[in-house]
Amino acid sequence: MRVAVYYAPPPADPLWVAACAWLGWDAERGAAVPQPLPGLAEITAAPRLYGFHATLKPPMRLATDYGSFMDDVARLAATMPAFMLPPLAVMDLSGFLAVRETAPCAPLQALADRCVTTLDPHRAPPDAAELARRRGGGLSAAQDSHLLQWGYPHVLDTWRFHMTLTRRLSAAEQAWVRPAAAGHLASALARRQACTALSVFTQPGPGAPFRVAERVALTG
C-alpha cells in the first residue's frame, strides 16, 4: 500500500465534481464517472490513477504503520490554519494541462513544506529501481538532492502547486484539449477555493487507483 497527503476540494464542491468527471474517476466514492467528451479516456489515464488532487506529501510506502502515520497527520493539521487559495485556472505545465494558482500563496507553500518534512519519518526509502525511474527524465542538482533526502524530486523549493488534468500533450492536442478543459471547469473555477483539510489518499497495490481514505480538518 502507498499513502499520500493531498489537497483536494470537498466531495460536494463543484470543482471536485467537474474535475472527477473530466478524469473519469471519483476518488471519494471509488467509482468511475462518465467523461464529458469523447477522446478523453486515453489522455487522462495517468492522472485518473491518482484522482483529482494537488500533491502535498507525495505517494510513499510506509516505514511505520498507518495508525501512527495518521496520528501525525492529525497533529500536523491541528497546527495549520485553513486559508483561501488564489484564483485557479487551467494552465500548461511542461506540456501537461493542470489547474494551477494564478498568484503565489505563502500559506499553501508552508503547508506543503510542513507535510514533506513532518511526515517524512513515516516514509520507506525508494529502492534502486524507483531512484532510476525518477532520474530517467533528468533532474537538476536540487531535485536530485530532494530525491535522496525526501524520496521525491519536486518538493520544497522545487514544488509547484498543480492539479493534473492530462498526460503530456502534443501541440495539436493542446489546441483542442485546453479550451475544452477550461470550458468544462469554468463555472467551478469561478468560485474561490479554500484549503480546509489534509486529504489522505491510499493506493492498495501497484496499478490500483488511489482513493480518499480520510480528510483531516486544518484547525490551527
Residue ranges with predicted function:
Residues 1-92, 106, 110-192, 205-220:
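Basic, often amphipathic N-terminal segments
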Residues 100-106:
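Secondary-structure transition/turn motif
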